C-alpha cells in the first residue's frame, strides 16, 4: 500500500472511490524537467507524464483492457512496455530496476487477485538481467468490485402500519389474535 501523501495531485484527482494504490514508481532523469509515474492500483495501471506549467498526460489501462505487460531488467535500468487491447502502448525506459521489478510483481498480483484464471507468464533470464511478459488469458473474466451498499428504504411509521394492519383485520385477511399480536409488537416500537 502506498501513502497517498507521496502521490502527485494529478493521480489523487483521478482515483476512483475505493480504489487502492498498490505500488508507485517515480521516474526522473536529469535531462527531464518533470517526473513520470507508473501507478499500480487494484483496478488499473496509470501512467502520468507531468509537464511544465501544470500540464500533464495521464493514461490508464484497466486490467480488463490490458493485453500484455513486457518488462526488461538490465544491468543499469529497466524498461516497461504496456499494451492495451486496442494496440496502444505505454513505454517507460530507464527506470530504477529494483523499483520497477516490484511494480511488475504488483501488477501480476493485482491481475491475479481479480482474474478467475491466472495470467500467463513468460520469463527469459540472461547474463545481465531478465525479461518478463505478463499476458492475460483470452477469456478474461473478473470478479466484480464491491459496489457501494444501497441504503435501506426508510421504515414506515409504526402508527401507519397499525392502520394498515387494522384494514387487513376488518377485511377478514387476518384474525383478531393475529391483529392483536402484531399491534402489540408495533406499539412496542413507539
Curated annotation (Swiss-Prot):
Q: Which InterPro entries has this protein been placed in?
A: SHOCT, YokE-like_PH
Superkingdom assignment: Archaea
Q: State the organism of origin.
A: Archaeoglobus fulgidus (strain ATCC 49558 / DSM 4304 / JCM 9628 / NBRC 100126 / VC-16)
Protein name, UniProt field: Uncharacterized protein AF_0689
Amino acid at each position: 500500500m502506498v501513502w497517498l501523501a507521496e502521490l502527485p495531485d494529478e493521480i489523487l484527482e483521478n482515483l476512483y472511490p475505493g480504489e487502492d494504490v498498490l505500488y508507485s514508481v517515480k521516474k526522473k532523469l536529469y535531462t527531464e524537467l518533470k517526473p513520470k509515474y507508473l501507478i499500480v492500483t487494484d483496478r488499473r495501471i496509470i501512467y502520468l507524464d507531468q509537464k511544465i506549467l501544470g500540464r500533464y498526460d495521464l493514461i490508464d489501462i484497466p486490467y480488463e483492457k490490458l493485453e500484455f505487460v513486457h518488462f526488461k531488467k538490465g544491468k543499469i535500468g529497466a524498461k516497461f512496455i504496456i499494451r492495451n487491447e486496442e494496440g496502444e502502448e505505454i513505454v517507460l525506459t530507464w527506470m530504477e530496476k529494483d523499483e520497477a521489478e516490484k511494480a511488475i510483481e504488483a501488477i501480476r498480483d493485482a491481475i491475479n487477485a481479480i482474474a478467475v484464471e491466472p495470467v500467463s507468464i513468460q520469463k527469459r533470464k540472461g547474463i545481465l538481467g531478465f525479461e518478463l511478459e505478463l499476458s492475460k488469458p483470452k477469456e478474461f473474466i473478473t470478479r466484480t468490485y464491491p459496489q457501494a451498499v444501497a441504503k435501506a428504504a426508510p421504515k414506515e411509521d409504526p402508527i401507519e402500519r397499525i392502520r394498515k394492519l387494522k384494514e387487513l383485520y376488518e377485511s377478514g385477511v387476518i384474525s383478531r389474535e393475529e391483529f392483536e399480536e402484531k399491534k402489540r409488537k408495533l406499539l412496542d416500537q413507539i
